[in-house]
Amino acid sequence: MEAVQQALHGLDVGSTEAVRILSWANSEIPAIYDRDQTAYLVLGSYRDPYFRRVRAVSDRLNRRYGTYAFLIGDLSDIDLPRLPEFRVKFHITATLSDYVAAVFEQDAGGEINELGKLGETEYFEKAYIFPRAYQWETEDHLSDEHDVIAAAAQLMATTDIDDETKTAELDALVDRADQAGIDISVDEVTTKLEEHGFEVPSYSWVHLNDFRLFELHGRCYPWTTEEELLEATDDLPGSPRPGWEQ
């Protein structure tokens, strides 16, 4: 019940609620906790059209030997009218899963709250994120001028910071580009942004910071097409796909 206490921040759980949680756990947990297979909790939006790609990641992982990939939505309900049931299910399953894979395509929706949970809890060490059209921001991943322009476009599309902050962050981005050996000025970046339209998802500044944290830890996999998303999924640790599928 430690995961339940973490989910509820020490809130007292009634006897009936405890019985229901334990009954649910006895039904759902064995497949997750099976030590002979690798368990992946897959997170993402349940809204169309995003859900289809989240399900595609789960299906791709389940092609591997000895793998159980699942969504919280695949699991039965616990019937906890008083308690935040999703939090309970999230913390129990995230605790028991070997890895957590999270797909992001927008700056709104429940999956964004999950990003915060992953970044601030012990689940961080087992988590891998897949943000759509995220542009690398650290100097290790800036290889040419186009990378800098794309990262700047992403910065300018950020939804929750003022122009002064954007200007300061653009200066910092150009400094990182310079450290990576890319000769480009702030004025040149601004001009190119005005001349060329770059369509990027409008992530918030908080989310971009979380993405950057995962990027620095080598567990961020940007993608633009579903094919790229599935190819990135193959890079997750765990059992490989069958040889005949390679």
Please provide the spans of the model-predicted regions.
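Conserved catalytic or regulatory cores that recognize and/or transform ribose-phosphate-containing ligands
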Residues: 1-246
